[in-house]
């Protein structure tokens, strides 16, 4: 075999590896505004969220017509918060907005703020453990209607799994 014949497969492998790395480098930072918009889209593709939260959960909106979930990576700081807005539409709990924080005043009886370290979000997104364990051991901190959250543990777990379904760069903090 000639040197040229041996070098072609190596060159092809190097190009393929470079393409994979370039794709990973283009992922938006986990919990950035752009990542949250993609998480909103993924919410709407997840029946356990759209259907199972369409009754009592979504109706508890404080009369404003939507619920807010703000989230951030603790190690990136509270200033990196993003927002999901969930609205009742056509009998479903649909994410109608994902991006930068727009709701300044939250209602703690209706809305949620959740934060965890990047490592913990990644673990929850992989399904290493669910919301009960995450909250019991302080791996997920949240403010909001705790009793309501306890009543929707199945959908809550699916929400945490969104973190693993939406590609995000965990090495960079959102700007």
PLM features per residue range, with description:
Residues 2-3, 54:
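Intrinsically disordered, low-complexity Ser/Thr- and Pro-rich stretches
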Residues 3-13:
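Bacterial N-terminal signal peptides that target proteins for export
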Residues 4, 22-26:
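Signals and flexible motifs at protein termini associated with secretion
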Residues 12-22:
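Bacterial N-terminal signal peptides
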Residues 27-175:
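Feature captures hydrophobic
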């Amino acid at each position: 075999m000639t040197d040229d014949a041996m070098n072609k497969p190596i060159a092809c492998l190097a190009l393929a590896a470079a393409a994979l790395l370039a794709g990973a480098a283009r992922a938006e930072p986990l919990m950035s505004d752009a990542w949250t918009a993609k998480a909103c889209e993924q919410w709407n593709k997840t029946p356990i969220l759209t259907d199972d939260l369409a009754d009592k959960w979504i109706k508890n909106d404080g009369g404003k017509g939507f619920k807010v979930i703000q989230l951030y990576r603790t190690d990136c700081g509270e200033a990196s918060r993003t927002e999901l807005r969930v609205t009742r539409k056509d009998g479903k709990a649909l994410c109608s907005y994902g991006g930068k924080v727009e709701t300044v005043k939250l209602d703690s009886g209706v809305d949620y703020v959740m934060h965890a370290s990047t490592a913990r979000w990644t673990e929850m997104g992989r399904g290493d453990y669910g919301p009960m364990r995450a909250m019991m051991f302080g791996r997920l901190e949240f403010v909001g209607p705790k009793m309501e959250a306890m009543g929707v543990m199945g959908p809550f777990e699916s929400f945490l799994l969104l973190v693993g379904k939406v590609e995000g760069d965990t090495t960079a903090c959102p700007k």
